[in-house]
Amino acid sequence: MLKSGFSALAAVTLFCAGAMQLAGQSTTNQDHNEGFFTRLGHAYINDWTASSNGLPPAPEPQRRGTPAPLNSPPFPSADWPIGGTPVIGAPDYQTYMLMQAINKNETRFKVYGWFSIGYNASTSNKGKYANAPMAYDVIPNSIQLDQAALYFERLPDTVQKEHFDWGFRFASIYGLDYRYTTAAGVFSQQLLQKNNTYGYDPVMYYMDFYLPHIGQGTDIRLGRYISLPDIEAQLAPNNYTYSHSLLYTYDCYTQHGINATTRLNNHWTVQAGVSGGCEAAPWSKYAKLTGNACAGYTWSNGGDNLYFCANSLNSAKYSYNNVSAYYLTYYRKFNETWHTSTEYWYQYERDVPNLCYGLDPCISYGPNANIGAHASQITSPALISGANGAQCNPAATHCYAPDWAIVNYIEHEWNNHHTSMTIRNEFFDDLKGQRTGTATKYSEHLVGLNYWIGSTVTFRPELRLEHSYDKPAYDAPTGGAPTKTTQLTFAGDLIWHF
């Protein structure tokens, strides 16, 4: 499976490169006489040896509104994260080596991607996925292809306010990380029926429609997109660290729907939309009409941002990841080299099947949560494959399953934007065990580095310690219950951008 999926992505990449090689005819005579791979090699050499990250210095692109608060690299983005939209008023800062080889990055249509390969050494070792509830490096003491990603993209021009513009993105990943992005109804048999270690997921496919005369610019996004809130994201380069916080691991990942984002002024941005729910395609039997409403407030000339988001508004009745979730995120820039990000959420599901029904004592099976239940004795709604039940009073067949979490990042950069350090601390309370499979409180602490070679090669080593306070939650053997309350991992990944 790994070989065939990897070959498919490689074939698509080479096909695009070969098909678009003729675009190089518009370059200089020297470029015209060079082959595609020669131009690609020169692009990487220029990226690694230029005095700035990427190509030799060029005029700063025009921007509307407050200045970008961060440097990217070494940070994932120059702007504070906001989902469901491009950053209205921000230019397209990115150049890509593949497009430099094809047409010197002279068009707004782009093909790009990356390979992310990760490793970890862990104190857990009893089962194939024994690092759970940690993600995405869930297989202990191993080296894995986390993501091979390929993007086709055109960004709308939201800097100008004169005319309508449009954009799109079609993004695919292959690798271990598909296990976290899979949506019911979108090639989901790979995970929900076959439980494949590696798989393919078209993680984003959407259109953007930019309307410049509504507020100070409005973007309407239609399709499958990353859920709106969160400091972190599913795609490897969009994160400070290799591993993800527990807070991020157990909330909503993607949605199929329509979302409108309006920039009212330099301070306020508002969002509203509808979708089929978290990780459920509209044609899936698990789809539920779901609303979202968010608002962001920026001050200190872009240095502070407060972002509130009700990301999934519906009945919250148990289904495939049908959580109702409310987020509050605060971003603060201290100076040119230090900033912090803090996120809190509360989420819940109703009428969740009780894994402890008729069982006293009730054993927590962690990532194997549903195997311990008297499933045949639980009336509708029944347990769903890939959606944990809860651990409640043994006399109840169903119950309310809430959880809450908070995470803080402290970030520092140096070495002329080539290196950054991350300190992450979080607390997560899975009150009924519905998210992780174990009803317990967790803490997680991480120190990581982010080192860039130019703007195309990233290395992210980290040391992470986590603990479950009420019962064992780590190192579960295949088909068995967790055996440890503490887990220590040394991990990292290498991202090669093209």
PLM ranges: what are they?
Residues 131:
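Acidic/histidine-rich, surface-exposed loop or edge segments in extracytoplasmic proteins
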Residues 274-276, 312, 346:
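Short, histidine-centered active-site or binding-site loop motifs used for metal coordination
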